[in-house]
UniProtKB/Swiss-Prot annotation:
It comes from Fusobacterium nucleatum subsp. nucleatum (strain ATCC 25586 / DSM 15643 / BCRC 10681 / CIP 101130 / JCM 8532 / KCTC 2640 / LMG 13131 / VPI 4355). GO terms for molecular function: cobalamin binding; D-lysine 5,6-aminomutase activity. Signal peptide: none annotated. Keywords: Cobalamin, Cobalt, Isomerase, Pyridoxal phosphate. GO terms for biological process: L-lysine catabolic process to acetate. This is Lysine 5,6-aminomutase alpha subunit. Its cofactor is adenosylcob(III)alamin; pyridoxal 5'-phosphate.
Length: 518
């Protein structure tokens, strides 16, 4: 029984609208692919490394086909055909193309059935590797006596140097962190390639590379065994390489991925057609790999008012839920985002925050909701900041938020020191323990401030979803409904990388992962 007396008929209507919005966009998504989707297929076929100029081989292959062949047939068809012709593996084919020793666009075409058969061993071996990673995660959790009950304490490291990040991450795990997110270097989401190898320089974060993923995964596994807890690793697959980074994460057993097309469109000016197509394949991969995705609704409240625009967050959560379901990603892996971002001077602001968080929990009961700390109104006064974080911590434990992005008392001053993290973890653990069953023991007053507020937000969200259903997601974004940010349908970065699929196009991984045995 919910605390908020929500109108469940209205919730159902909102879900139906969101379902239609996603289905409408899916028509476009199903008819198109992008250069990064094709590069992801290359990576999943075992193509890795760089050419003599440092260009990733997946980029070399896809660019070669784009310039010399017909990309609308899809990269899998070219690679499979070349495997039959040359008797070589995809990696060897890519290396020869890079050295200009092979032209895969000028070969005699074989039958589609034979091409798919040629790819079968390698596609199945990749899928088995991802399944083994998923099992390894489950085995660790079992070894440590099951998953953590209550919120995951989620912290961020961002030094630019992966080896320094390891030092910070291991310290955070020992201090009590459950999830470590390695922030990406500034602007990586705008690169149309994924850098290669271990990196030691970054700005505001560290490069997301497969080798960096491997280094951090090993460090967290080692400290996890020492502590008897499974420490989750999180990275970011928004931006122009969404599905590629999802694939790298699946291959290296990451546990969480920031993954939201709307975030990329609004806050990174990535073309909407491009990133919605990319999001679909990235979510199929994340769903199959057992990765929890985190969505970016919290960011709307950094550019728009958290009280007036709360309904846009809920509407976006409904839409993100439907986009995830279409990609085969279960509710248990949907870290739908929201945030504690109301102006601290607001009268009864805490009640409004509590109502919003409780509403998300009741409407998405199985989702490991991602709850963001106050950032917009942190002033650099560390004492007040610590109290703002304490109120945020109270909302999390009271309403059962799951992915708890730890607030930092030094927010708005500098990137956290290890000591800042220790104090913030101590604050959260104190509150989570002291108020452990508080949420179960209280009821909300009928007709009170919180009940009224939640019903109001739900009503506005349902109305907004009805409007979006009529307009479609593309027009809605053009009008600036989310976060007050307008983006044109043919503007932004990456549109040149979108293409319509030929009717013989195939992506061998979609049937294996979307309909596949988990």
């Amino acid at each position: 029984m919910g605390k908020l007396d929500l109108d469940w008929g209205l919730v159902k209507e909102a879900r139906e609208s969101a379902k239609k919005i996603a289905a409408d966009a899916q028509v476009f998504i199903d008819a198109h692919s992008t250069v990064t989707v094709e590069r992801t297929i290359c990576r999943l076929l075992g193509i890795d490394g760089v050419d003599e100029f440092g260009v990733p081989l997946p980029n070399v292959i896809v660019d070669f086909i784009k310039d010399n062949g017909n990309i609308s047939l899809g990269v899998a068809k070219y690679i499979g055909n070349a495997m039959i012709e040359t008797k070589l593996q995809p990696q060897e084919i890519a290396e020869k193309v890079a050295k200009k020793e092979l032209d895969i666009t000028k070969m005699q075409w074989h039958d589609d059935f034979d091409i798919q058969l040629a790819l079968k061993d390698i596609t199945h071996s990749t899928v088995e590797r991802i399944k083994a990673n998923r099992k390894a995660r489950e085995d660790y959790l079992e070894q440590f006596g099951g998953d953590k009950k209550g919120p995951y304490i989620y912290v961020i490291v961002a030094t630019g140097n992966i080896y320094e990040d390891v030092t910070q991450a291991v310290a955070a795990a020992r201090q009590g962190a459950d999830v470590v997110a390695v922030i990406r270097t500034t602007g990586q989401s705008l690169l149309d390639f994924v850098p290669f190898g271990a990196t030691t320089e970054g700005f505001g974060g560290t490069m997301a590379t497969q080798e960096n993923f491997r280094i951090m995964r090993k460090a967290l596994d080692d400290v996890g065994v020492e502590l008897g807890r499974y420490i989750r690793l999180c990275n970011y697959c928004s931006g122009l390489c969404m599905p590629e980074i999802a694939a790298m994460g699946a291959l290296e057993r990451l546990d969480m991925m920031l993954n939201d097309a709307l975030y990329g469109i609004l806050f990174r000016d990535i073309n909407m057609k491009r990133t919605l197509v990319d999001q679909f394949f990235s979510r199929i991969i994340n769903g199959f790999a057992g990765v929890i995705i985190n969505t970016g609704e919290d960011n709307y409240l950094t550019t728009a008012d958290a009280i007036e625009e709360a309904h846009t967050v809920l509407a976006s959560q409904f839409i993100n839920e439907q986009f995830a379901l279409v990609a085969g990603l279960p509710e248990e892996q949907m870290g739908l985002g929201h945030a504690f971002e109301m102006e601290p001077g607001t009268e009864n602001g805490f009640l409004l925050e509590l109502a919003q968080a409780q509403m998300a929990r009741e409407i998405f009961p199985k989702a490991p909701l991602k709850y963001m700390p106050p950032t917009k109104f942190m002033t650099g006064n560390i004492f007040k900041g610590h109290i703002q974080d304490a109120l945020f911590n109270i909302v999390t434990i009271t309403t059962g938020q799951k992915v708890h992005l730890l607030g930092m008392l030094t927010e708005a001053i500098h990137t956290p020191f290890m000591s800042d993290r220790a104090l913030s973890i101590e604050n959260a653990r104190y509150i989570f323990n002291n108020l452990k069953d508080f949420g179960n023991d209280i009821e909300f007053k009928k007709g009170g401030i919180m009940n009224t507020r939640a019903q109001e937000v739900l009503k506005k969200a349902a109305e907004l979803l009805k409007t979006i259903e009529t307009m479609g997601i593309f027009k809605t974004i053009e009008k600036g409904v989310f976060g007050g940010v307008r983006r044109p349908i043919d503007g932004g970065k990456g549109l040149a990388g979108v293409f319509e699929k030929d009717n013989t196009y195939f992506n061998p991984f979609i049937p294996l992962m979307l309909g596949g045995d988990r």
